Each structure stands twice: as structure tokens, then as C-alpha cells.
Amino acid sequence: MNVEVVDFQAPDAPESFTRSLRTTGFAVIVNHPLPHELVQQIYDEWLAFFDSDAKYAYRYSDGDQDGWFGPDVSETAKGNTVKDLKEFFHVYPWGQYPAEVSDAALRYSRTATEIAVTLLGWVHDHTPDEVRDRLSMPLPQMMDHSTRTLLRVLRYPPLRGDEPDGAVRAAAHEDINLLTVLPAANEPGLQVRDLAGAWHDVPCDFGSIAINAGDMLQLATGGYFPSTTHRVMNPTGESARRSRLSLPLFLHPADDVVLAEGRTASSFLAERIAELRSQDRKTA
């Protein structure tokens, strides 16, 4: 599977990135403006937070979907029957934020969003005219006045050996949004599925960022950019006794953006959240 590693500063970066996203749904970028030290700081601070009782004061708001989601309410991937082995905190600029950590995650969210919007501009500029003609507006313009972009601080706890049969850290799924920005986690495990159904490890070199297309981009472009299936597998050996932390930023358009005829970003998001809740009820 030819997931390209793209130098963010290279003259041909926009074309190379868009080509990889088109053919695989994924790309890996290096030499980008996101400080490695900032990512490590967030991993250290939030691991301590997840290990503390402080998290219980920030339980998620059902309406706004901000705050801490414990393992008891963790997601069940669409089409799956077992909950993922994870807990996470949804960070929005307007939402709950723990007093027990610094503002590092907020600073990361702003920088990652800027990178994602730049990448979205690259995609728009290097998309064929016949695909761009499908769009209700230029891709970067979809982000104007958006309040939906989400940073998920994810913690996959150490495995204890008593996990339910078939449970994995993150079952095979696709993302809902336009683009996802995912810096290398502190442990490997992320895999992506190619068109033939084979699974491939995504590079975990610290300092690299994996980018994948989501369902909204696939819908808006009529399938030109595929929303690629990915998963996080359970580790073995010593790695199984360590937490895995991850910082996906999900780039979402403004609510009123029309993705396809009769489907706005808001209605599509509501539809997908309803599907996830339905799956969760089946596994409760």
C-alpha cells in the first residue's frame, strides 16, 4: 500500500499529499510546524490525568459531547458488537477542560487545525475540475465559522488479560469528518486496510503525522477521496502492559455546509452519532 511520506515544506508537497489521499485515503507528513515536544508534553500530562480520580468530575455532556468518556461508555464501531478498549476526553475550544493539565492540548488543537485547513486547501487545488464542480463551495471555505472541529485525547489502558472476547483497542472503522490529523502515538498499533482487504501498519516514527480522509470528504467529492478503514490492534508482550495515547484531531465543517444534495454537515453528523448510540445500546 503506497501511503506517501510527504515533506510538508517541499515544493511538490501539495501534489504528493493529494495523490496519496486519492489512492489510499491516507498520507504521512513530516517536517511540519507541530512541535514534537508539545505532543510529548500532552502525552505525559494526560496519562497522569487518566490515571487519577480527577477525570470523574468532567464526565461528558450528552448534548454537547464534550468531556470525559469512560470505558463504560466507550464507542462500539459500526457493525461491531463489542466496545472498544479505551477512554477519551473530547476537547472543544468552548467545552470542558481539566484544570489539572496545562493548556498544551489547546495549543496543539489550534496548530493541528491550522495544518488541517492548509491540507484541505492543497486537496482542493489539486482535485480535478469535474470533482470540484460537485462541491457546494471550495473545501477550505467549508471551515468558515465552524465550531465542530474536535480534539480527542485518547488513552488505551494496559491490557489485563480479562478483556471480552473479540475486544480490541479500536475496531475497524472510518472517521466521520473531512480530515483527521493524527501524530504518531507513544506506542504502535494503528493499521489501515487497502482496497484488496489487506491490513498494513501505519508508520509510528515519533514526529510524523498521519492524515486520513473521512466520510464527509468522501461524500462531498462523490467518492473521489476514499474514507479508509483503519483500526488499533491489541499489542502483545511488554507493550500490552503499557498505555497507548493518541491525539486525533477531527476537522469538521460548519453545520450548514451542504455535503451532498439534501445532506448538511449537521444532519450527517447527527445521523452518524445516532448510529453509534444505537450500537452502544446493543452492547450495553
Question: Where is each model-derived feature located?
Answer:
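Peripheral, non-catalytic segments flanking oxidoreductase cores
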Residues: 1-284
